[in-house]
C-alpha cells in the first residue's frame, strides 16, 4: 500500500496531488501532509487532485472531512478534483458528494 502526496503553493490556492491508496495504514500520513498545508499560510483555496487515488476507505474520507472543516473554519474553500470512478462511487454512496465541491478536471480547478 503506497501513498504519494505532493503540494504546490500558488498565490491564492494550493494544489495537493495524491496518488495511491488511502486506507487505515496510509491515512495518518495523509493527515500529516494536509495539516502541513493548512499551517503554511492557509491558502484561500485548497484543491486536492484525486485523479491518482485508486482506493479510499472510510478512514481516508474522515481525513478529507477533517481537512474540509479546518479550511471552512478559516473561511477557505476545499475542492476535490477528478476522483476516479471507484472513489466517486464512495462519495455518492456516503452522501459526501453533496458535502464536498467535486470538479471533474483538475485543470479546470487550477486554471491551467
Q: What are these language model-derived features?
A:
Residues 24-100:
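Amphipathic alpha-helical interaction surfaces in cytosolic regulatory modules
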Residues 3-32:
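STAS-typified acidic loop motif
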Residues 1, 12, 50-54:
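Short acidic/polar alpha-helix capping motifs at helix-coil junctions
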Residues 20, 84, 106:
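Short, flexible active-site-adjacent loop segments at beta-strand->alpha-helix junctions, enriched
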Residues 107-111:
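Short, charged, intrinsically disordered terminal tails
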Amino acid at each position: 500500500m503506497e501513498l504519494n502526496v505532493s503540494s504546490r503553493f500558488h498565490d491564492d490556492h494550493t494544489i495537493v496531488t495524491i496518488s495511491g491508496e488511502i486506507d487505515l495504514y496510509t491515512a495518518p500520513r495523509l493527515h500529516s501532509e494536509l495539516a502541513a498545508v493548512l499551517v503554511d499560510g492557509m491558502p484561500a483555496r485548497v484543491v486536492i487532485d484525486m485523479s491518482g487515488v485508486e482506493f479510499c476507505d472510510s478512514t481516508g474520507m474522515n481525513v478529507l472531512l477533517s481537512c474540509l472543516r479546518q479550511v471552512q473554519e478559516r473561511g477557505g474553500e476545499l475542492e476535490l478534483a477528478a476522483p476516479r470512478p471507484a472513489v466517486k462511487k464512495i462519495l455518492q454512496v456516503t452522501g459526501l458528494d453533496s458535502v464536498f465541491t467535486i470538479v471533474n478536471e483538475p485543470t479546470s480547478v487550477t486554471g491551467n
